[in-house]
């Protein structure tokens, strides 16, 4: 019997997580951590409904990825079950390295290390725990797999990440301009020469998608009030980092202290991946 976990999502309805590798990924503490990370950071000061999390977004992107894989298969694009599982695992973990407050921590108390870099490090850490079961997912995430359209579904101009966050952020903020027709866009996807393409009759839907994304940046992501709050937070963190560098004892959670009292750069971060980092 096919066993699965069913999750009721307010944006897409029921999401099926099959028992096995994908279910183990969803249950992993590093992915569950995203339940405590708001998707839109400080945007809730402007849009009080924007309380949704990176975990919800990851599940939504997984749902869209499953739909996209099924749609591409119906058009004669052969995708092995192992490839489908791997790309679904990759999209589940694509934001696993995200910190709180959206992108505020990048290039502030963490220098030159993007959340994608941290996501990859954490994926490799989980892969070791799972005895290499995520090797193919990591290859797809790093764009090292021959079928490049799989990576483009995870990270590209028309990936499942963007299709979910526009719908989800629109839903929770109430800004209707982001409510794109994701189902229609997915139906228009195809593959040519191992690259993701769109059928000509889907161009209008893509134009709407691009317009919706631009409007969401204007109205939500770059809203002057939330940006001002982010600037104040960045100034506070940089000042705290400066005081920490002088050996001053600061009142902070163990997790924040780790970043304040250690220099985290792209080069140094590799040596920290074996540590059990504080989670509170």
Predicted segments — roles?
Residues 46-86:
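Alpha-helical phosphate/pyrophosphate-handling elements in metalloenzyme active cores
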Residues 60-65, 114-127:
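An active-site-proximal "capping" alpha-helix that borders the catalytic cofactor pocket
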